[in-house]
Amino acid sequence: MISPYEFKTNRIMTLSVVLPNTRRFAFKVFQIATVTSLIIFPFLEVATAQHQDTTQTRIEQDIERALEEFDSEEADINLEELLEFLQNLANNPLNINRVGIDELLQVPGLNFRLAQNIVQYRNTQAPFQEVDDLINVSGIGQVTLDRIRPYLTVSTGLDRGRDLYLNPRYWTENSRFEGFSRYQQVLEEQRGYQRPDSLGGFVGSPVKYYQRFRYTSNHLSLNLTQDKDPGEPLEHPADFDYTSWHIALQNNGRLRNLIIGDFSVAFGQGLLLWSGGAFGKGSEVIRTPNKNERGVRPFTSAQEMIGFRGVAATYGNRLQLTGFYSNRQRTASEIDDTYVRFPTESGYHRTLNERERRLNLGQETFGGRVRLQIPNGFFGISGFHNRFDRPVQAGTLPWQINNFEGQKLSGYSADYRLLAGPILLFGEAAYTDNGGYGVLAGTELELGSRTDAVVVYRYYDPAFQSIFGAGFGEQSGNPGNEEGFYLGIRHNLSSQIRLSSYIDQFRFPAARFQQRQPTSGYDWLSLIEYTPNRDLRFYALIRYKEREEEYADIDEMGREFRTLGENRRTGARFQAEYQVNPSIRLRTRFDMVRSRSPQNNASWGYLVFQDIRFYPLQKLRVDARVTMFDTDDFNSRVFQFENDLLYVLSNAMLFDRGQRMYVVINYQAASWLDFWLKAATTVYENRNVISSGNLQIDGNRRSDIGVQARIRF
């Protein structure tokens, strides 16, 4: 075990003395590029590019909030749909002179109080002339306005009437067509493509293909999405492994939507029904615990096993009635000719074994919701019934004994949101007919004009089988086997400085994943943001998490036994972002992580990157980044959210020692045609094998390439 001083000294020696040639060269380039950029770029005038891409930057920041320290090893979570939701919201901004509270609640950064204030201001004062007029609405400051601006617009529309539905202009109002095709591939050969099919190798090519065609207007949506994952076969152009489609009517008076095809469902606080992505604990300390429901929406993501397929509709205004019916095939591991495991969500059908069980389980689901809106909030009641055509059998491990078994499951919930002066109350209680239940109750408070706070309590019974839920908590995925108390606070020290912090105490009443007994823990985060002007932003963040975990030990008699210890992880981050001019944005980040295992073994890790966004031409955007990372082991791994192709989510987890570099080029060849190119490579200095199993690469380098073209009218 080394002391912090020894660690610091060793790291300095590593950087300045014993760096291999490649790292020393990369570090020098990193230093020179950073210093040169900061000195020279402020004096450059790029006449051909005067476009400040604040919309894309805001989407990236919102997604990065959702990805804060996300660890795909702990649980399978879907955030691709969340990315597409935000991108679509930015591409089709809401008209603040027409939308209601429900639509405004879809915007990141808005809660029920602010949405209600916007509608009241519009109805009692005057229609908005521009989005910046929102600064006059109570509770909306410059920081909030900057965050919500990309998702809002001001425009006029056709007034509804009974005869209007027969007018073609009504169905084509603000219409847009978008079609794109995407190609992605790992360039190094992976072991799965070397093995024959009979020995578990991949059946198809290493290429990932994706294409989508979508038509949308204010009142109509048509979509076709097709996808082939790496390793899956594509024998002819129409033989994609996954196809998604929908026809949807939306915003047609009291018929708020009618969807035929693929759709997602998100009700209440997500304890019972919430398909698709959701923000987890992170730097947005106030809004995150209080979910803003999205109702039933058309589903366009390539996440194959997340949404529903059938028909769904919502009717009404203050009293809304929603119903849905879904019947689709799922993929599950076979136990024998009768029983299967619970269906997987990966969507991979690459090997003969995976393809044999492809879509081998039928799933039928129906449900609905009644929601009553009152002047200061709303109440809702939701329910579903689910049936598989084959019995599902849970695993035999200690943390699997409460998992769903059988063929049928029903669930019911009631939720509320009430505004009383400076206090916003929200919550949901849910029950599944196997006897399990879950409860979440929270309060948002305005503590003066500069301070907001939120307090949330949650209890998810170990027997709570919320197979479609995604409630707020420590564990990602379906809520269950958790109790916790969350406190978040945010204070605007001035117009330039904002402080945020949360603490979350949690426990797991029964065995959780890879643990055989009840455990507990807590985590906290503190964040300071400094924005001296619109072109310069700094923030510093510290996060600490401590969770009990089991480990094996030896007693005096030499016998092995399992006991509990604390797994601790501390992370610190500093980031600076500088909009040098409308054509150049620089971003620098430094992350440091310290992890201590239950056996009291400490490990350290760091990440540092320099990022640039550059518009050499008005229609050409270049994002480039050089990252250096060094971690003692997997426990001290680091994360970084990356720019990528449109609608592609990239959150890289890095460990061991090496560098990662990427460049993303976006070129608008015409008003109706765009191209994207991403090339990335990760070079490890202390590994000759990357990954394992069918994904193993023999060598120290992994390279990726992606190409995408989009047409739109």
Named regions from a protein language model:
Residues 30-42:
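Bacterial N-terminal signal peptides
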Residues 231, 236-331, 445-447, 451-466, ...:
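Outer membrane beta-barrel
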Residues 1-28:
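N-terminal secretory signal peptides that target proteins for export/translocation
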Residues 73-87, 124-127, 135-172, 267, ...:
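Alpha-helical interaction/regulatory segments in DNA maintenance proteins
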Residues 166-197, 215-224, 258, 286, ...:
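Transmembrane beta-strand segments of Gram-negative outer membrane beta-barrel proteins
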Residues 227-242, 298-304, 356-359, 430-432, ...:
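Outer-membrane beta-barrel proteins
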Residues 202-206, 363-375, 379-394, 403-713:
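Exposed, low-structure sequence patches enriched in small/polar residues
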Residues 111-114, 141-142:
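Small-residue hinge/turn detector
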